[in-house]
Amino acid sequence: VLGPHLSDETEFTVELHPLDATTDTLKRLKDGGVNRISMGVQSLDDAILSKMGRGYTFHDAERAFYRIREHFENAGIDLIVGYPGEECALSPRHARLAKWGLAHCSVYSLILEEKSILANQVRRKVSPPPPDDDTTLNRLSIVAAFLKEIGLNRYEIANYAAPQRECRHNFAVWRGEDYVGLGEGAHGRIGRLRFQDFGMDSMKQEEVSPDADMKERTLFRLRT
């Protein structure tokens, strides 16, 4: 629907769960004008994926990404470092990422939200605690060095990209440009209007003051 109305300069990204990356879905996304895919892998460790309740294995994610690459050149993944039970920064499976043809990779440290299920499990000692901050920072550095080795350069605190594959949405956020987010949990900005989509036809909108807008832009620019 949107495809014919988008310019060559438009970045149209869809975030996919590995189990949703079917051939039929990918064809429809391509036909609809989508030109970039981000797949939430989160971990390459099957035991941790199970604890996360993700519903797939590393091999499922690998096969899904190869399907994505059959339809999209501009495709990347998200990873999380510091999940409880994580024993090291890199495993032999990380070496396989070199063959995936990644255009982009986002690497986030785990944030243990106070009211989350995981935080409750840690408090009840059902789950081990996450690694301490120093360990997590060290592992992030190791992952960053690995990504550089496979051709992904760091261009922002948590983001790495192949040449000319930096995420335009990230740049739009930093520069205070307008962007639109669709789907549950998505955020958008048009001028001084901010909105968040909660799904089920529920959306929060807020118009911020010029001063708040300027402060927001300044803080986001620090991420580079």
What are these regions (language model features)?
Residues 1-224:
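C-terminal scaffold of the Radical SAM
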